[in-house]
Amino acid sequence: MARVGAKSSGAGAKKKGVSFVIDCSKPVDDTILEIATLEKFLQERIKVRGKAGALGNSVSITRYNGKINVNANSNFSKRYLKYLTKKYLKKYNLRDWLRVIASNKDKNVYEVRYFRIDDEVASYEED
């Protein structure tokens, strides 16, 4: 049964490209995280049309100054990028010290930050 009043996107509709940034500058400066391995991991694992590593012209990944920029010409989920980044941290045993959070400043930016352990240390000192 067809939906009444639903408009289909015609041939004239353009796919909107999206751009996401993963900011890893603090862990990279401390040499805990290697940005080249994260870039390679994303290139190998991002799936386009069901195939991993076949980015083609639809997805491009670049790195600069501790940040990775992912540009997609087609639909691309921000959540999928977070999932892959967390998977990378788990693979290289960094998940215990680092976490991936969305930036408050910009909608399309993820930040890789350290867990805040100074609050826990203060609570242990009080006991």
From Swiss-Prot:
Q: Which domain of life is it from?
A: Eukaryota
The record's section on InterPro entries has: Ribosomal_eL22, Ribosomal_eL22_sf
Determine if Ribosomal protein is one of this entry's keywords.
yes
**Any single biological process term in GO:** translation
The protein's UniProt keywords, in alphabetical order, are: Ribonucleoprotein, Ribosomal protein
Q: Which GO terms describe its molecular function?
A: structural constituent of ribosome
Q: Which family does it belong to?
A: Belongs to the eukaryotic ribosomal protein eL22 family.
Name of the featured protein: Large ribosomal subunit protein eL22x
Q: Which organism is it from?
A: Arabidopsis thaliana (Mouse-ear cress)
